[in-house]
Amino acid sequence: NGTERLPEGDRFEFFPAVSVGWAVSNEKFWEPLRNYVDFLKIRGSYGIVGSDGFDDAGGTRHFVYFDQIVIGGGGGYNSGPSPSQQYWSVGPAVNGYASSNVHWERVKKLDIGVDLSLFRQVNITFDYFKDKRDRIMMMRANWPEIFGYFNAIPWGQVGKAENEGYEFSINWHKDFNRDWSIDLRSSFTYTKNKFIDKDEPNYTYPWQYKQGLPMDGYRCDGYVVEGLFKSDEEIANSPEQLLGSTPRPGDIKYRDLNGDGKITPDDMTLISEYGWRPRIQYGAGVTLRWRQWDLGVFFNGSGNRTIMVGNDIAPFGERNHNLMQFIADNRWSADNPDPKAKYPRLGVSHADLTNNTAASTYWLRNGRFIRFKTLELGYNFKYGRVYVNGDNLAVWSPFDLWDPELNWYTYPLQRTFTLGVQLKF
């Protein structure tokens, strides 16, 4: 493969792959079992995949081997014989330094699978996969300030990560007679990942390191919450919370992990090994056919997933939002001084409540769900088909603030009903 994003001499790289399979059911010794297991194949593959899709959104430039200099973007100075004749000059600024010794990012991919057919009705597929990714482009974190790079910290290929999991699917088709038949299908995927090598600062506390933990989006970091403050006296006798607003009764109380008497970002830690990206995804559906009629349903869902709602729910004013009734009814107040209230106190400005919007166990929610995705009834005739379809019919989830499959700012999925005709000529 070749790319223009890399310097000459590193633009082309070879990425080999190999695969092998054995159809065991084709062997003579399998003949006694063929009426039960009519097909069995064991397969495996290993290969290297390259990518030049460095993290553009994260700050890398398209041509990573060039410095980025902005004329007139730096500091300024006055020159001239007198104040009335001075001339203001602005120098250039370095917004990004070239990354040296840059290559393709690589993923070494291993897959081992089995394909199985039982009684000429049931098809089963299983895959185990493991990916090892290296040369990940990351902004250097362990970079001494004495080097003087200011706001243009270099990027380098210093990251390594691992992704591992398995996929399973099963499909069953059965013709009971000329009139009746059934198709049943299901799938299940589990995946997990972690940083193998991550450029990090020399943190003071061990819980601040991310190496060995799931990657961003697959975990949640935040503060550990001990409840809500009940009184000014409790606030005075607790660690000082330096999170933007002065704590008041009804505000969230955080745990001082390092014991220094202050709540700062040094007290943030891993609060869930699951993030908004699910580890588990699954789906199941069935189609029944009777003569010219067919009826199909499909469900999908995900698990091992959490949602952080702290700053997203934002019921705290100064954003032109209406206050939801369920928040008002379940908030901490003088009339409801419950240290385990579902929502902290309300206020008249967002700046007065920034203490309560930090990522924490208080705002962590279980994001698993099951969705009734589709229901379709159809009638087939000689030249086509008539059908009625419903999509996104229901969702079951412990998370009830918005659609658990979406972000809070995403346009919601619509429940739709369709009446259609398909014609064949």
Set out the residue ranges of the language-model regions:
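Conserved small-residue
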Residues: 57-66, 175-276, 336
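Glycine-rich, aromatic-lined ligand/substrate-binding cores of catalytic
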Residues: 273-308
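C-terminal extracellular loops and terminal segments
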Residues: 152-162, 204-220, 271-283, 315-329
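Conserved active-site-proximal loop/helix segments of enzymes involved in bacterial cell-wall
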Residues: 139-142, 263-265, 313
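Extracellular/periplasmic, surface-exposed regions of secreted and cell-surface proteins
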Residues: 1-217, 362-425
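Short glycine/proline-rich turn/loop motifs
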Residues: 91-94, 262-267, 352-360
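Extracytoplasmic gating/loop element in the C-terminal half of outer-membrane beta-barrel translocons
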Residues: 3, 247-249, 302-385, 390
